Amino acid sequence: MVKITYISHSCFAVELEHSVLVFDYYQGELPLWDPEKTIYVFASHRHYDHFSKEIFRWTEQYPKIKYILSDDISEASYDASEICRSDLTRIAPNQTETIGNCVIETFRSTDEGVAFLVSCEEKLFYHAGDLNWWHWEEESIDYNRQMRKDYQREIRKLVRKKIDLAFVVLDPRQGGAAFSGIEFFYAERQGKPCVPNAYVERLWIDGSSAYF
């Protein structure tokens, strides 16, 4: 059984038998987890609503904690001096790293930083960060065409991956284009489960949970 908890904005926590994955925390109340579990904290990029140095305070409660940060997050933006270097990994697009019992693969975002594909305890999870089919009416035709091309290129890399659950951007600020990214993802994945994230307060209540 896997427990999914929505924290806020793009942040979800995935609780497994021995591990917890926390993606893109910036605010909100966390559940209480067994301190014997290993906590993996992911930050996909530097935007204020995807990263907070608050995460480094969690070491007081959870001694088995690992941080995986996109390399666009400047080291000057946080004080990680008290964190053992072996507990913090900076990661770039198109990398694969094994950290603890997780195998982590990254993809290039169409905005900043990376998207994560994480294999943990025989489950495979995808978190988009800000990798999305961004389309803005105020931008040029060439800009929007390039965004479509870049997004589709990255998502097609996932076609053969047996993802158990995916967290995919749904941003209503895009108006009629808001569903383009998640619809393309869903079609390429042949209807496999995906969870909308980012600006989805109408769909989720902070702190709400689901199991699968």
Region spans (language model):
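Portal/gating segments that form or line small-molecule/metal binding sites
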Residues: 56, 62-109, 114
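Conserved beta-strand hairpin/beta-sheet module of binuclear metal-dependent hydrolase folds
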Residues: 1-33, 114-139
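Binuclear metal-ion centers of metallo-dependent hydrolases, dominated by the metallo-beta-lactamase
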Residues: 4-9, 78-99, 174-212
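Active-site metal-binding loops of divalent metal-dependent hydrolases
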Residues: 10, 25-27, 45-46, 72-73, ...
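Active-site-proximal loop/helix segments of hydrolase catalytic cores
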Residues: 110-183
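Short loop/helix-cap segments at secondary-structure boundaries that form the rim of catalytic
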Residues: 13-16, 30-37, 58-60, 75-83, ...
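Active-site metal-binding motif and surrounding structural segment of the metallo-beta-lactamase
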Residues: 27-75, 156-174
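Divalent metal-coordination and catalytic microenvironments
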Residues: 14, 45, 104, 130, ...
